[in-house]
Amino acid sequence: MEEPLKYFLERTTPWGTLARAHRQWQLRKKYRRWKEAGAVPPLPNWGKQQVVIKYLREFAPAVLIETGTYKGKMVYAVMPHVQEIYSIELDPTHYKNARRRFAGYANIHLFEGQSGDVLPGILEKIQQPCLLWLDAHWSGGSTAKADLETPIMQEMECILSHPCAARHVLLIDDARCFTGQNDYPTLQTLEKYILASQPNWVFEVKDDIIRTHARRSSDRQE
């Protein structure tokens, strides 16, 4: 797909650096307002991006896999922090827009379809630890609805059976939705399922994001 001139200039000229800085300033401003208003979930985009970047820096995986591209804001934010990005989007319009947005980046790989169906094929080709940002769920508006409101258990099945599963880092958005309704397991059910496969992992919820991965020395000290 041909890269639009706007995105080509953003990618190859100093204007792109300024545009990125301006976007980050706008997002930080919204985040500060959210904090001042009481920090009621969900976490704003800038906050989510900073969480993912933090874990990319701590664990240093070469690959990030995202389920739920939406408008590509997470992909755009983490580009400087990881070598390869794979992102899956169910909605055809969002997928097409993302392909145009990232057409000039050889290290960004976009896929259309249900993440529970597409993710196994991606993982089959990647024989190394990944950070997985799991955000593929129906949330109204322009988001697409698949057979299930969330494919999280399908995703878990293929992720935890991957040869490098023990070294993956999983960040799952919208922890508040894990109530046992609308195809979501409860947090307790999800924790039990994950730790049955990876008993040496931590499982914690903070800022509406489930964070589960191998224990670090800092985790053992807590």
Language model features with spans:
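A short alpha-helical cap/connector motif
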Residues: 1-131, 137-222
